[in-house]
């Protein structure tokens, strides 16, 4: 089941476009509180937009995005990101991106590509879709609810929250979408369409069934004719039976002769069996001798070698581990050398770049020197290489020209200063005396008043600041300045500017390329007719090639055609028609040869039937003897051993006996070792062989138990009992070996007889099968010829025709291409308008990506600039605070000084007034004369100084640039070249060390491989010891068999066999004569059989599977008839099911509405409310419903729309949405209530809160139940007792920039 758990908002409505706000949704309750206009509803709008892709009501024209007029930006990017769990438990993230561009007079709203990402259990992410339309369809599917439920129920907008009481047409539209009525209507329409199409198919099937019935009747007539011919063949069979009775008498005599053959055959059979056994063992001896290294050792010596082999393997393993440790240390050293090499390569690159800058600076110095010389002629003829001398002379020239300016200014300054001093003294004297005269009269009373005020202020003054607070603020100011300096040293903004400039350059290059493609498209359009013609020809060529490919695929892939006319993948098209003509001629020739062979084989077949019966009698007697021996063996063999398994069981028993004996010997050999290992394990808790401590107690206890078992005395007794049991069982098997040999001898005779019988049968069968094969071949050849005529020849002719047309089209394409190449100068060759536009479209996509990157970089730069500004402003605020504190501290001292000074000044004023009045008149006359002289001197000074200052500024600017570059050149000459050479040498030394280390590593690796090979050879050596033991045993068995063969009397048995063969030949000659007479009769039967075969062949070809086809078509007809009937039944059942589904859902909805209304509504005027669904009509397309919300007052039903208050509307709408959510939201238990208390009085608010509390309480254990409540009323949270379900709520507020922010708040901070 699905659930949502995190939402991120950026640039939506009042949410800042530069910062991202995030909210996490809990279970079972998420609370969002905030004042009106803070941005609470925006959260619901973002949830709805993320899940459905629908914008909120009345938000066209980009008003859903943060207003660019507020930020002063032209491009606003907004993003909504929702993290949720899908209905199948998969973690997913959906991202929606939108953009608002501000132009001069209008704004442009764009929906950008989004993203739907799935996250698996290991954290790997996979993008499922990026297109907005696909997201609109896929997100509701992953949430497990239809889009209508998300839009009208789960994330219903506040403006649309009263939709259950909207006008009837709007209400019907929304309920039809919620019930998905159109989906079921389309299903019914599809069923009706299928039924209509099937009616047409039924008519055609009826015609086909009638035609097949006629062919079925003809087939029955032919079968009757075949039956009559078979009757004649049966008459001939009776005559053949008399001849066969005589043949049976000969067969009985042959059987008696065969019985006399048994005695000598037993001896020969036993000899033969011994020879076969000898041959088998000899093969094993030879195989082992060739596959192993034979050791010239006795069997005991080999067994001792095998027992001591494990210690050698252990030593080799220890040696191999030491080598691998050496390799590991060499690899670590190689890694450190590689790291050093990388750092040296990086430093070398930096120094080489510095060297390149050094060369450029030297050239720049030469250019600056020439420019200076050309402009000021202040240098001597110095070579460009002596830049130190150039720098020295420039410095001297700079000092000279600066001194000249200084001298001029000083000269005028002295003269002007003298005159100004005189004038200033006069003016100052006049001003001072006048002001003193005027102010001193006023200041006396003012000073007295100020003194009094300062005295009062000093009394009431409070120390607002101390020296400690001043020191604290100074420390903060120093910290912030250091942070600013650190931030500026990182050069973040210049780096971002550089990236933006690089991307802008790329964008300019791409725009130029797009313009070039646009020019090519325009030029291409000028030859539109030729390009159009070329496009049609290319299309025709592709069509012809497709047809040729289809013909080629049919010729190569059709199994029937491939058998007749095989083609390779690399066949020559030009030779195809000739190859077919050769094939057709060969077919005609093969048919003629096949007919000739059929006549010859028909004659041979009649002579091959008489050899079968004699051999069959011999088999019967041998079978009886075999049964007696089998009965004897069955009575004496053990229950777990059958006759067929005797040799395998005997071999397995010998092997088991040998294994048991070896186990006993091995136990006796290793008993002392196991006792020592047990002692060490119990005492030291370590392995006796490798001395390693045990990993844990469980491993130790397991090993101790195993060692105790092997050292137990009962264990040896068990091994001895096993050896004795195996030995007795092996002896009982060997006692029956002679009967097995007898049985094998009888089986061999039966096999020989069966071979003779099979040979005779094979002769007859071969003749018959060859004749049948030739008949089949004849039919096959005729079918192949017919296939070649009817199917292959038309394909070959069409292929040849298409090849010719394709060649003509290619010539036309080449001609037009050559004509177009005159106008086309592109390196890419001739391209059509569509091809050019496709490339231009790809470039436009790249351009959009570049612009997006530039926009992102610009946004990052702006953020960094704002961060810098905030830091600077903070420093200024701290400086102001420090200044204010310092001013406050000094203020008290200043007041004391001021009071004292003012009192002294009051005494001096009275004496100065009289002196000032007389002196002012004399000073005014002297001032007028001095002012006239001073004005003339200043005009002359300004002209000369302005000209010289301009010259000095130009010289200083050029010389400063020269000296800066010169200092960089000198620094690199002093340090850069030496460091570059040192780095190169160190890099070469490092490479040599790495090469030497690699050689050592290769040498060690070869040693490891050699040791591993030796270890593998050791395993082979162990295997070789075991196989040498096996070879000694086989040779012993071979000697025993040879002695047994030499003991038997073979010569007498062979003489008896010769007599038997002579008598058998006489009987066989007589048998063959009778068989020849019998063959004549069989020949006549063959002719009749040929007629039957001809008729049968006609049945197989012309009327092949006629009854099956008739039955198939008849069944198809009946099936389709039944299907149409089933479709009618299914349509009615579906319609009925839809009605039932609709009725049940409406019952559930109304039941929940009734319960919630009665628990919530506190008024007495409305008893309850319901949703009425009235059936409109039963049209061709199905039933339709109208919906309305009704209320009950004293059992009277009334339409609620237009008859209820605003508060009742809100409450009814919330209850209906809750009911719909519980009914249709099984897979997605989320529902959001935006301002549910709107228009509700206090009592109904409290009732609604309690109802929500009960709903949460009932569904809190449902894993995916999530109730989201948005409200400005914190009392509502108290009525809900929200603290019982969550420990926090989210507060939405505006910051000082009026941007919306989401804040996590403890639920206990709510004041009810």
From Swiss-Prot:
Q: EC number(s) in its UniProt entry?
A: 3.6.-.-
| Molecular function as annotated in GO | adenylate kinase activity; ATP binding; ATP hydrolysis activity; double-stranded DNA binding; double-stranded telomeric DNA binding; G-quadruplex DNA binding; metal ion binding; single-stranded telomeric DNA binding
Q: Where in the cell is it found?
A: Nucleus; Chromosome
**UniProtKB keywords:** ATP-binding, Chromosome, Coiled coil, DNA damage, DNA repair, Hydrolase, Magnesium, Meiosis, Metal-binding, Nucleotide-binding, Nucleus, Phosphoprotein, Zinc
Q: Does the keyword Cell wall biogenesis/degradation apply?
A: no
| Residue ranges occupied by any Zinc-hook domain in the UniProt entry | 640-741
Q: Which cofactor does it need?
A: Zn(2+)
Q: How is the cofactor bound?
A: Binds 1 zinc ion per homodimer.
Q: Provide one Gene Ontology biological process annotation.
A: meiotic cell cycle
Keyword Repeat part of the UniProt annotation: no
A Pfam short name: AAA_23
Query: What outcome is documented for mutating residue 60 to E in this protein?
Result: Does not affect dimerization but shows decreased DNA-binding
Q: Which residues carry this modification: Phosphothreonine?
A: 568
The entry's Zn(2+)-binding residues are 687, 690
Name the residues that bind Mg(2+).
41, 158
Coiled-coil region list:
185-347, 403-558, 640-678, 712-741, 787-1108
Domain of life per record: Eukaryota
Report the domain remarks: The zinc-hook, which separates the large intramolecular coiled coil regions, contains 2 Cys residues that coordinate one molecule of zinc with the help of the 2 Cys residues of the zinc-hook of another RAD50 molecule, thereby forming a V-shaped homodimer. The two heads of the homodimer, which constitute the ATP-binding domain, interact with the MRE11 homodimer.
Q: Which PANTHER family match?
A: DNA REPAIR PROTEIN RAD50, RAD50
The miscellaneous remark of the record is: Present with 830 molecules/cell in log phase SD medium.
Q: Which family does it belong to?
A: Belongs to the SMC family. RAD50 subfamily.
What's the protein here called? DNA repair protein RAD50
């Amino acid at each position: 089941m699905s659930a949502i758990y995190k939402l991120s908002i950026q640039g939506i409505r009042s949410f800042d476009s530069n910062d991202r706000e995030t909210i996490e949704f809990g279970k079972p309750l998420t609370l969002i509180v905030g004042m009106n206009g803070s941005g609470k509803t925006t959260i619901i709008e973002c949830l709805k937009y993320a899940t459905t892709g629908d914008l909120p009501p009345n938000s066209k024209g980009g008003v859903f995005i943060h207003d660019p007029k507020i930020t002063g930006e032209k491009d606003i990017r907004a993003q909504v990101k929702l993290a949720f769990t899908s209905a199948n438990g998969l973690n997913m993230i959906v991202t929606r991106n939108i953009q608002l561009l501000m132009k001069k007079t209008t704004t442009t709203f764009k929906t950008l590509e989004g993203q739907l990402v799935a996250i698996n259990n290991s954290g790997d992410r996979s993008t499922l879709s990026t297109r907005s339309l696909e997201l609109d369809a896929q997100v509701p599917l992953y949430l497990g609810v239809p889009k209508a439920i998300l839009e009208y129920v789960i994330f219903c907008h506040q403006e649309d929250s009263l939709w259950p009481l909207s006008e009837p047409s709007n209400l019907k539209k929304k309920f039809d979408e919620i019930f998905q009525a159109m989906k079921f209507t389309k299903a019914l329409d599809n069923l009706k369409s299928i039924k209509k199409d099937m009616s047409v198919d039924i008519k055609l099937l009826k015609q086909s069934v009638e035609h097949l019935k006629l062919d079925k009747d003809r087939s029955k007539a032919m079968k009757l004719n075949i039956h009559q011919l078979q009757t004649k063949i049966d008459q001939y069979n009776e005559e053949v039976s008399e001849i066969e009775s005589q043949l049976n008498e000969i067969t009985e005599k042959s059987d008696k002769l065969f019985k006399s053959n048994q005695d000598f055959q037993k001896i020969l059979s036993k000899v033969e069996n011994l020879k076969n056994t000898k041959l088998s063992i000899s093969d094993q001896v030879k195989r082992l001798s060739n596959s192993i290294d034979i050791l010239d050792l006795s069997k005991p010596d080999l067994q001792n070698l095998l027992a001591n082999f494990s210690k050698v393997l252990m030593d080799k393993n220890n040696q191999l581990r030491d080598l691998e440790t050496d390799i590991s240390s060499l690899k670590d050293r190689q890694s450190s050398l590689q790291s050093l090499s990388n750092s040296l390569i990086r430093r070398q690159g930096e120094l080489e770049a510095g060297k390149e800058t050094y060369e450029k600076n030297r050239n720049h110095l030469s250019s600056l020197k020439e420019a200076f010389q050309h402009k000021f002629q202040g240098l001597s003829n110095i070579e460009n290489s002596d830049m130190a001398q150039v720098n020295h002379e420039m410095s001297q020239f700079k000092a000279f020209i600066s001194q000249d300016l200084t001298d001029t200014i000083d000269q005028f300054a002295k003269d002007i200063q003298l005159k100004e001093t005189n004038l200033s003294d006069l003016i100052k004297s006049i001003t001072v005396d006048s002001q003193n005269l005027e102010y001193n009269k006023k200041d006396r009373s003012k000073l007295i008043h100020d003194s009094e005020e300062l005295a009062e202020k000093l009394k009431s003054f409070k120390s607002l600041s101390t020296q400690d607070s001043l020191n604290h603020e100074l420390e903060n100011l120093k910290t912030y300045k250091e942070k600013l300096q650190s931030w500026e040293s990182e050069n973040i903004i210049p780096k971002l500017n550089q990236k933006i400039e690089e991307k802008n350059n790329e964008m300019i290059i791409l725009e130029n390329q797009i313009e070039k493609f646009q020019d090519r498209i325009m030029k291409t359009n000028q030859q539109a007719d030729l390009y159009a013609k070329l496009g049609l020809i290319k299309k025709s060529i592709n069509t012809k090639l497709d047809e040729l490919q289809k013909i080629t695929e049919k010729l190569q892939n059709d199994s029937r055609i491939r058998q007749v006319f095989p083609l390779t993948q690399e066949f020559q098209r030009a030779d195809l028609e000739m190859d077919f003509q050769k094939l057709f001629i060969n077919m005609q020739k093969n048919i003629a040869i096949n007919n000739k062979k059929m006549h010859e084989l028909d004659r041979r077949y009649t002579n091959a039937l008489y050899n079968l019966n004699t051999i069959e009698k011999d088999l019967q007697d041998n079978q009886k003897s075999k049964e007696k021996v089998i009965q004897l063996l069955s009575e004496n063999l053990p229950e777990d051993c059958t006759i067929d398994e005797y040799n395998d069981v005997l071999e397995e028993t010998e092997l088991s006996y040998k294994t048991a004996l070896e186990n006993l010997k091995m136990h006796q050999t290793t008993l002392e070792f196991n006792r020592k290992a047990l002692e060490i394990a119990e005492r030291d808790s370590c392995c006796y062989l490798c001395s390693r401590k045990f990993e844990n107690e469980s491993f130790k206890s397991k090993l101790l138990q195993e060692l105790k078992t092997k050292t137990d005395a009962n264990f040896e007794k068990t091994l001895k009992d096993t050896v004795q049991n195996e030995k007795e069982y092996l002896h009982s098997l060997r006692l029956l070996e002679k009967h097995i040999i007898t049985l094998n001898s009888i089986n061999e005779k039966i096999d020989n007889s069966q071979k003779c019988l099979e040979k005779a049968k094979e002769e007859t069968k071969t003749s018959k099968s060859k004749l049948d094969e030739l008949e089949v071949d004849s039919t096959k050849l005729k079918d192949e010829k017919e296939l070649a005529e009817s199917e292959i020849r038309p394909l070959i002719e069409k292929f040849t025709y298409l090849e010719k047309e394709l060649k003509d089209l290619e010539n036309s394409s080449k001609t037009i291409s050559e004509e177009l190449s005159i106008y086309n100068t592109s390196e890419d060759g001739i391209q059509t308008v569509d091809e050019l536009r496709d490339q231009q479209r790809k470039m436009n996509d790249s351009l959009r990506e570049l612009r997006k990157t530039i926009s992102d970089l610009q946004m990052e730069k702006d953020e960094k600039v704002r961060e810098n500004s905030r830091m600077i402003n903070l420093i200024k605020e701290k400086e102001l605070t420090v200044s204010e504190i310092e001013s406050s501290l000094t203020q008290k001292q200043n007041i004391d000084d001021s009071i004292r000074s003012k009192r002294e000044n009051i005494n001096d004023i009275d004496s100065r007034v009289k002196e000032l009045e007389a002196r002012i008149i004399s000073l005014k006359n002297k001032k007028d004369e001095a002012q006239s002289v001073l004005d003339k001197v200043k005009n002359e000074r300004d002209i000369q100084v302005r000209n010289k200052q301009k010259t000095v500024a130009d010289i200083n600017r050029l010389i400063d640039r020269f000296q800066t570059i010169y200092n960089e050149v000198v620094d690199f000459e002093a340090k850069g070249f030496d460091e570059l050479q040192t780095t190169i040498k160190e890099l070469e030394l490092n490479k040599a060390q790495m090469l030497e280390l690699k050689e050592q590593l290769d040498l060690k690796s070869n040693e490891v491989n050699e040791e591993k090979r030796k270890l593998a050879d050791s395993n082979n050596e162990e295997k070789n010891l075991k196989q040498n033991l096996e070879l000694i045993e086989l040779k012993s068995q071979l000697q025993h068999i040879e002695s047994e063969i030499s003991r038997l009397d073979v010569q007498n048995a062979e003489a008896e066999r010769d007599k038997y063969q002579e008598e058998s030949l006489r009987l066989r000659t007589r048998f063959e004569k009778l068989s020849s007479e019998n063959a004549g009769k069989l020949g006549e039967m063959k002719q009749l059989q040929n007629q039957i075969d001809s008729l049968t062949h006609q049945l197989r070809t012309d009327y092949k599977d006629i009854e099956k086809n008739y039955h198939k078509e008849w069944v198809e007809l009946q099936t389709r008839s039944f299907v149409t009937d089933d479709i009618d039944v299914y349509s009615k059942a579906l319609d009925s099911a839809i009605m039932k589904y609709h009725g049940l859902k409406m019952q559930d909805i109304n039941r929940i509405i009734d319960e919630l209304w009665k628990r919530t509504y506190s008024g007495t005027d409305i008893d309850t409310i319901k949703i009425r669904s009235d059936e409109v009509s039963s049209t061709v397309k199905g039933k339709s419903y109208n919906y309305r919300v009704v209320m009950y007052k004293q059992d009277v039903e009334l339409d609620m729309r237009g008859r209820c208050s605003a508060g009742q509307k809100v409450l009814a709408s919330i209850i209906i949405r809750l009911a719909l959510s519980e009914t249709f939201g099984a897979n997605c238990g989320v529902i959001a209530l935006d301002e549910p208390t709107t228009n509700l009085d206090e009592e109904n608010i409290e009732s609604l809160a309690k109802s929500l509390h009960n709903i949460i309480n009932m569904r809190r254990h449902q894993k995916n139940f999530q109730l989201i409540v948005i409200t400005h009323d914190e009392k509502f949270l108290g009525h809900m007792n929200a603290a019982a379900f969550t420990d926090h709520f989210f507060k939405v507020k505006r910051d000082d920039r009026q941007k919306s922010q989401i804040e996590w708040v403890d639920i206990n901070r709510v004041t009810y």
